[in-house]
Design a protein with these regions (language model features):
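Short juxtamembrane and helix-loop transition motifs at transmembrane-helix boundaries
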Residues: 197-210, 223-235, 254-262, 353-367, ...
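Hydrophobic alpha-helical hairpins/lids featuring a short glycine-rich hinge
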Residues: 166-243
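Core alpha-helical transmembrane segments of integral membrane proteins
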Residues: 211-316, 386-389, 393
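Soluble N-terminal domains of membrane-associated systems
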Residues: 1-197
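Hydrophobic alpha-helical segments embedded in the membrane of multi-pass proteins
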Residues: 220-224, 244-252, 272-273, 375-381, ...
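Core mid-bundle transmembrane helix pairs that form the ion/substrate translocation pathway
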Residues: 269, 297-303, 314, 327-383
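Alpha-helical membrane-inserting segments
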Residues: 228-233, 249-257, 273, 277-286, ...
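C-terminal transmembrane helix-loop-helix hairpin of multi-pass membrane proteins
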Residues: 10, 15-17, 29, 37-39, ...
């Protein structure tokens, strides 16, 4: 066979793979690539008779191309996380969910887990919720969870489907946790009667729910909580009033910035800086009418305690207790990063304006008066933190009552020689052991309240012990580190770490004693 015949055969074979219609005039030019000359990058040598009318050289053409303004092809830089339209990925929306394809069942399960994870609850509760929904739908699932994402593998009748869900940010929303608990109870009772679209409509209602409180209400809640926190740390009326102003302004700014969709650390640093400055301005104002008010500078620490990440700190410990190491370590890292950033900003502002974390002056109250005030301030503090976590008023009040009992007990055990003098004790209980007992009591009381009030246990336990997180110790450790006082830094840091470690241990023991689902590994 000669060369001409071989070329003819090759052309016939290529024509068989031509996917374009020869009669389509719009696509004619696409079938054959244009020659390199058409891109005008290769310069032909000009004729001698053209002289100065010859085209510019190749180098000048390249220079002109490089000097042009950048071309835009309709691609815009958007958010790092795209929103999923769950209704668009459903293939059998009007079919009963139990009879739907595996992909539709996976969308229901993953959307349920996404809403739970976005609410700030721990990995065990997210997995448990997804497992219970999967059980209703007749699917076996395996879930690997982290702070902002999870991977879910669904198995049914020899088929396997894998799905990954990612969140743009994290936060705490106890009202949404409560709504998801109600959704779960509804599903376990009537779930086999719902279609795929009905599942997604219920989940859409939960997802589209607005926060219960405006930024100014969040600021007021932080003001009340931090003012009460300052009293529990040993502060007096002047420190409480200034912390009220500082925390209110700081958390209002922080909530407003977060509402605009900006980053958490931008909101955090702005809120802490404004809280410290507002505390000083309030102190200067009081100094005009109250002699000696400027000597009460140490309360500025209380004005910034609204940023202490109590929820991720506690849930990190609970995740680690259930061997959800990936989620636990990520939550712990997130909490530590917030603490470090907040304390560094607080230290920087304190250095600029001349504030220092000194000890509070004794209040001189009797044991009975101090105990009663601790009960009231513990309730106010826990109630305020619960509102910051978006708890409804009744839920926040229930958490406040639990915190009033457990936190007052903790403080009384630490100050036992002065609070209970008739026992004749020489020393009080170590703060670490008292924190364990306080968390244990909170967990046991929350178990009783969960039965009576149907509130999620975590929405009662965590706010009730957030007030036990040693924010003062954490700040002082970072303050002394920045001033290169290593001895004091290590002392306050070790104290803070031990107390923080014992808080989730106490909750875990209470959960083990009262919840069989938590008690077992499977």
């Amino acid at each position: 066979m000669d060369d001409a015949s071989e070329r003819a055969i090759e052309e016939d074979m290529l024509d068989q793979f031509n996917y374009f219609d020869d009669e389509d005039e719009e696509l004619i030019d696409r079938r054959e690539p244009a020659p390199l000359d058409s891109f005008d990058l290769v310069d032909e040598e000009p004729d001698e008779d053209e002289g100065e009318s010859a085209e510019p050289s190749q180098s000048s053409r390249l220079d002109s191309l490089l000097s042009r303004a950048p071309m835009h092809h309709g691609v815009r830089a958007g958010a790092l996380h795209m929103k999923t339209d769950w209704h668009q990925i459903v293939t059998a929306g009007d079919e009963l969910a139990v009879d739907a394809p595996l992909t539709d069942k996976s969308s229901i399960i993953c959307r349920t887990g996404m809403l739970m994870l976005a609410s700030g609850t721990g990995a065990w509760r997210v997995r448990d919720t997804m497992n219970r929904v999967a059980d209703v739908l007749g699917v076996t699932i395996h879930v690997d969870l982290s702070l902002l994402s999870f991977e879910c593998t669904c198995i049914e009748d020899g088929h396997c489907f894998n799905e990954v869900v990612s969140l743009p940010t994290t936060g705490v929303n106890t009202h949404r946790i409560w709504m998801m608990e109600s959704f779960l109870k509804e599903i376990e009772t009537y779930g086999r009667r719902f279609t795929v679209h009905e599942y997604h409509e219920m989940l859409k209602t939960v997802e589209s729910s607005k926060p219960d409180y405006a930024p100014w209400q969040q600021g007021l809640a932080a003001a009340c909580a931090c003012g009460a926190f300052v009293f529990l740390l040993g502060g007096g009326p002047i420190e409480m009033a200034c912390a009220f102003v500082g925390a209110g302004v700081g958390n209002f700014a922080r909530s407003h910035i977060l509402k605009q969709g900006l980053g958490q650390f931008s909101a955090l640093t702005t809120g802490v800086a404004l809280a410290c400055v507002s505390y000083l301005l309030a102190l200067l104002g009081l100094g005009q009418v109250i002699p000696g008010a400027m000597s009460h500078q140490e309360g500025y620490i209380g004005a910034m305690l609204f940023v202490i990440p109590g929820f991720p700190l506690i849930t990190a410990g609970l995740d680690i207790a259930k061997l959800d190491m990936r989620s636990g370590i990520e939550r712990l890292s997130y909490a530590v990063s917030i603490i470090v950033m907040a304390t560094l900003v607080g230290w920087m502002v304190a250095e600029c304006v001349g504030l220092a974390p000194d000890d509070f002056a004794p209040l001189g109250l009797s044991p009975l008066a101090l105990t009663l005030l601790r009960v009231v301030m513990s309730f106010v503090g826990v109630f305020g933190f619960s509102v910051m976590f978006n708890s409804p008023v009744k839920m926040a009040a229930a958490a406040g009552l639990i915190g009033a009992v457990s936190n007052t007990l903790r403080l009384t055990l630490v100050d036992a020689p002065t609070m209970i003098p008739f026992l004749g004790l020489s020393t009080g209980m170590p703060p670490e052991a008292a924190a364990f007992i306080g968390a244990l009591v909170s967990g046991l009381l929350a178990s009783l309240a969960e039965v009576k009030l149907t509130y999620p246990r975590i929405a009662l336990t965590v706010p009730s012990i957030v007030i036990m997180v040693p924010g003062l110790y954490l700040y002082r450790s970072m303050y002394y580190m920045c001033t290169f006082d290593t001895v004091n830094m290590l002392g306050w840091f070790v104290r803070a770490v031990l107390i923080v470690a014992f808080l989730p241990v106490g909750l875990g023991v209470a959960r083990t004693l009262t919840d069989p689902r938590w008690r077992h590994t499977s």
